Amino acid sequence: MSKTLKKKKHWLSKVQECAVSWAGPPGDFGAEIRGGAERGEFPYLGRLREEPGGGTCCVVSGKAPSPGDVLLEVNGTPVSGLTNRDTLAVIRHFREPIRLKTVKPGKVINKDLRHYLSLQFQKGSIDHKLQQVIRDNLYLRTIPCTTRAPRDGEVPGVDYNFISVEQFKALEESGALLESGTYDGNFYGTPKPPAEPSPFQPDPVDQVLFDNEFDAESQRKRTTSVSKMERMDSSLPEEEEDEDKEAINGSGNAENRERHSESSDWMKTVPSYNQTNSSMDFRNYMMRDETLEPLPKNWEMAYTDTGMIYFIDHNTKTTTWLDPRLCKKAKAPEDCEDGELPYGWEKIEDPQYGTYYVDHLNQKTQFENPVEEAKRKKQLGQVEIGSSKPDMEKSHFTRDPSQLKGVLVRASLKKSTMGFGFTIIGGDRPDEFLQVKNVLKDGPAAQDGKIAPGDVIVDINGNCVLGHTHADVVQMFQLVPVNQYVNLTLCRGYPLPDDSEDPVVDIVAATPVINGQSLTKGETCMNPQDFKPGAMVLEQNGKSGHTLTGDGLNGPSDASEQRVSMASSGSSQPELVTIPLIKGPKGFGFAIADSPTGQKVKMILDSQWCQGLQKGDIIKEIYHQNVQNLTHLQVVEVLKQFPVGADVPLLILRGGPPSPTKTAKMKTDKKENAGSLEAINEPIPQPMPFPPSIIRSGSPKLDPSEVYLKSKTLYEDKPPNTKDLDVFLRKQESGFGFRVLGGDGPDQSIYIGAIIPLGAAEKDGRLRAADELMCIDGIPVKGKSHKQVLDLMTTAARNGHVLLTVRRKIFYGEKQPEDDSSQAFISTQNGSPRLNRAEVPARPAPQEPYDVVLQRKENEGFGFVILTSKNKPPPGVIPHKIGRVIEGSPADRCGKLKVGDHISAVNGQSIVELSHDNIVQLIKDAGVTVTLTVIAEEEHHGPPSGTNSARQSPALQHRPMGQSQANHIPGDRSALEGEIGKDVSTSYRHSWSDHKHLAQPDTAVISVVGSRHNQNLGCYPVELERGPRGFGFSLRGGKEYNMGLFILRLAEDGPAIKDGRIHVGDQIVEINGEPTQGITHTRAIELIQAGGNKVLLLLRPGTGLIPDHGDWDINNPSSSNVIYDEQSPLPPSSHFASIFEESHVPVIEESLRVQICEKAEELKDIVPEKKSTLNENQPEIKHQSLLQKNVSKRDPPSSHGHSNKKNLLKVENGVTRRGRSVSPKKPASQHSEEHLDKIPSPLKNNPKRRPRDQSLSPSKGENKSCQVSTRAGSGQDQCRKSRGRSASPKKQQKIEGSKAPSNAEAKLLEGKSRRIAGYTGSNAEQIPDGKEKSDVIRKDAKQNQLEKSRTRSPEKKIKRMVEKSLPSKMTNKTTSKEVSENEKGKKVTTGETSSSNDKIGENVQLSEKRLKQEPEEKVVSNKTEDHKGKELEAADKNKETGRFKPESSSPVKKTLITPGPWKVPSGNKVTGTIGMAEKRQ
């Protein structure tokens, strides 16, 4: 049964029972009894007697009643409706102790008997039965009166008191009548009984007790005395505490209440219930004097909280208000009496649309009373009365094969890949046959030749399916493997139902559509262009349907076809609605069929999976993929690809003109305008050919739950981009299979924690970790403590089941965990169609492809990103789309490319079947000009929230600190997001406005202080499944370190790195829905472990920079922005110099000048002696500038695998920590000119002091390996080249030991990383090419001078980099290797090959010592392109090992460095550091 308004407790739940006795004379009840029918009141308790002499009431068991409580029963005997005297007589009749049943007076039951009798309830409900009991008791002492004349056999004063109208009105005005009303023009009433009975009346006690024992068989004859009377004072009950109203007929027009013991007119009608103002007439309800047959097998009768009866069909797991036993006794509509409705019909009193009628059996609505309609047709000689009349085959339905009428046909069919080749219809109710609708051409059934349309399916492989549901039979066919045979028994002789204009049809296919649940295959698929004025449209059953004219649709002359489908009943004009669906164990819970405007929802089979979907909705998009041009089977395949539990948004068209096979029935008999199809292909909708009021009058809102949900959203404070989901779970032995988190404070929400493997929640598939728990069995949990929530779950466990309402965040465009298709996210960049479009979208004509020619400059890329679907798309769908267009790029300037456009060819070569890597390579090979063949995507306007569109969200598209938009388009980052036309490490993915943020601490990622709303901007979720060794990532930070939580490392081949969306340096904002702000490191681990095999992380993209413990001040974001504090806006020249590796950057032979120069303009003043041609593809560049890291760190390589990306990220991570220590390397890395703009440059003033520059700090010294090589070789680009091998041991130590903030642990890890780094560094030097460079080795004297001029820097604050002091003993041999790590590598590769082996051996030893000393400045001459290739090979080796390889080191005595804030170096120290480079000019 669908969810209705949340109900409060019925008065029945407040009934109290107790056993009382009294100390006194027998029969002297110890409590005062007040009220009574003679006063028009229920009997109720007065004060309890406490006289010591006798009559004192004593409660034996139960809770003592309170004075004023209404007395309902005494020892099980109802006393409501009895006089006070008779009530006391019943009490005295029993021995003490006696059992009393009482209830506190409320809004429904109070002392006023007249009030309760004036209310109208559903027949069979608790209240309706109580009303009948009251009347039974009343008629013991009173006789109803009427103004009509006596009928034959009626005795005045026995059956009725026959009085005049004047006498009746006098009684009514005097208040002597408990009930009054009219029926058939006559007045009826029930007078109050006299307080004292006449001497001729028998004692009522015997009658009360006797009738109570034989209640089911011996109904007293006046129980329905006023059952047909139209009450003058009828009203709806007001439940206690504003309960939902359980009574119905709020209009008060219940033709209900006459009474006569022998008149059948009195025994048939009952007003029925509705949650609104409606009446469902159960006029065929079995009366109490009739013996009811048992319910059908697996049916159950139950009561709602308000006492209303409903029926549960366990066969189909559905509920209904209709008694299945009454179906066989249902009358034809024309045989019903006035005021009576046929079985299954309901009367709706709607304040907006007036009165209309609902046929629940056929899901139809109409304004005309079906009984009046049927009688009118009968008078006109029309035999056919539409769906209200039972179909012929329904009247002959049987579950017994022996009672079938017709010829039995047996067939054996072999299942092909396309199924069995026939469609089925029927099975919507247990009393309906399943019949063959069509036999598909060339299918197994057609080849067998034995099956024909109309055949009733009797038996499948020996299992009788008569009475089975549609879904059950489809599932049986699905379970048959391909190439296996199935034996069918069919019965020929039953025609197909006449009312099959739009039936539920299922193709019995090999992979039948969504769930085994009635996915339909229509016979005709018409394009709207085919509809021409005057053309005749044939319905599926071959009958002539509607003639299309220039003005619109003319309905058929047959009035029986004039119905309003419930699908269009809720809207007055066409609207596009996005509905989130969840795929259940058996599918999405609905069936589809072809229609002229697309695939239409044929039937709702299981509404819990497709809440909000309605019959008749036209499907436009599935998961943001346009399916209007797809065939029925293609749409089926699209739906089938989603796994169980997947969230699938569906864009549907609802409302507006009905489909061409139906028209709306209006209250008038005027011609019905169902709309024009002239504007179908117009981009702008034409005016509606009918006023909205006509549609409203013909389309009443039928679904009370839908009205409730719509109204609920008006008042409910529901966060945007969330959806609420109801999950019903049955308890297993191990429980419900999930854990609960949160509830630690009054403002803390409750979340779903771990989903237990193989538990009930996991098997159900809908519940997820991090879902916010809203309600448990209808009880809100917001604000409740953790213990209270557990108590609620304990209560639910006792019941064996629980209904959970959870709220889930919707991340538009984000990858759903269950779906590994990135295709689903492609069109989300443009969003989904807006909701206010009023046209009737039709299948658009295929878009014509067009060519777009892009030209780029040498220093830029083409400026677009291609996304490729991982899963094989449906036929005809191009899997490659434009995922992003970079602002200001060639793609943006041309104006012809839009996000979502499909790319079918590159330079005339089709790419439809090519992989993503091949496409990227193809575009890169095109040089500076590329021609794209584009098929424009249909216009999209974003989801309702408007936050889903990349074009609508420039803030997300261009984020500061080089954060890539790729975070919002998750998928295979390495495969999907490489920049087209640029090399791996130089992809130009950001506009100039991105880089200007680098000098603004406010926009840095490090700024995490603020509201949670601000914190979550730009974040994206990642759900990981635990691998054999965990989730594959490690954390840094926590409250105890006074910093946030960051991704520290990614394990090789772990789930995190395979996912491709997590990167080193990303900040963790939430773990399984719980915010991480202010939580400890230990708590973060606990949250991850609590998620079981899955964890849901909300990440904010980082820059690859991981702050050190102590550098991070969560209360002061600027304090963590040490890197940026001294920066000035980056000049464009330096920007391009550091960003674009493919450009030729002029550099000084002494490359320190490039890194230490104050302004980028100074580069122009220095004449370059040598230039270095930079290789574009250098993923091994580990020590490239921080600017490049910040800007393009998030851009994964387009042609390299994860290893390159991981290695790069790890290096950046290390450089980040170096940057925290602020060495000259760091400013160079980050825009060296920028940072050093505020630092006195010793380069020009005191070149002799240059060696001091290298001794600023251990970290700086390590960085200097890159720094110095930059000067000596090709400037910053040279440094970038050498990054692959120049990751310092210091940096590696930080990466390896980042979890431990202690210095001792840092030292241990440092030593280990040093040994590893030294070993790998020596190997990296053995470049097979053997080519050498000149001017690699400087004089030993110069090297010694460098060593001696080194000074220790007290400026560094890194705690873990405390080094040992070593004697500074330098030989010529070692001096030649006192250059930085990169220099050492270069020396080996370009230096003296004769001594290479010796050098390598020494390098291993020196690299171990190097961390304890400051590296010497290295001088490297210009490198050739061949040597760059060698470096690339060496870097590849580094990537394989994931280690950073120091090249050389020299033992230099160093002092301990104490942590502290970074200070700008004084002039003398800096100049001393820089002097050597000047000297070498």
UniProtKB/Swiss-Prot annotation:
Gene3D superfamilies: 2.20.70.10, 2.30.42.10, Guanylate Kinase phosphate binding domain. Residues 18-106 are annotated as: Interaction with ADRB1 and TGFA. The keyword Nucleotide-binding applies. GO terms for cellular component: bicellular tight junction; cell junction; cell-cell junction; cytoplasm; membrane; nucleus; plasma membrane. SMART domains: GuKc (SM00072), PDZ (SM00228), WW (SM00456). Residues 191-202 have a biased composition (Pro residues). SUPFAM superfamilies: P-loop containing nucleoside triphosphate hydrolases (SSF52540), PDZ domain-like (SSF50156), WW domain (SSF51045). Pfam families: Guanylate_kin (PF00625), PDZ (PF00595), WW (PF00397). Residues 293-326, 339-372 form the WW domain. Residues 410-492 are annotated as: Interaction with PTEN. Ubiquitinated following interaction with HPV E6 protein, leading to its degradation by the proteasome. Degradation is independent of E6AP ubiquitin ligase complex. PROSITE patterns: GUANYLATE_KINASE_1 (PS00856), GUANYLATE_KINASE_2 (PS50052), PDZ (PS50106), WW_DOMAIN_1 (PS01159), WW_DOMAIN_2 (PS50020). Residues 182-273, 542-570, 821-843, 939-976, 1170-1481 are annotated as: Disordered. CDD domains: PDZ0_MAGI-1_3-like, PDZ1_MAGI-1_3-like, PDZ2_MAGI-1_3-like, PDZ3_MAGI-1_3-like, PDZ4_MAGI-1_3-like, PDZ5_MAGI-1_3-like, WW. Residues 726-808 are annotated as: Interaction with ADGRB1. Residues 851-938 are annotated as: Interaction with LPAR2 and GRIN2B. ATP binds at residues 121-128. Residues 114-288 form the Guanylate kinase-like domain. Residues 255-265, 1170-1183, 1328-1363, 1375-1386, 1407-1446 have a biased composition (Basic and acidic residues). The modification Phosphoserine is found at residues 234, 595, 699, 832, 915. Residues 557-570, 822-833, 945-955, 1254-1277 have a biased composition (Polar residues). Belongs to the MAGUK family. MAGI3 PDZ domains are used to design peptide ligands that bind and inhibit PDZ domains. Interacts with ADRB1, FZD4, FZD7, PTPRB, TGFA and VANGL2. Interacts with unidentified tyrosine phosphorylated proteins. Interacts with ADGRB1, LPAR2/EDG4, GRIN2B and PTEN. Does not interact with HTLV TAX2 or TAX3 proteins. Interacts with DLL1. Interacts with PRRG4 (via cytoplasmic domain). This is Membrane-associated guanylate kinase, WW and PDZ domain-containing protein 3. It comes from Homo sapiens (Human).
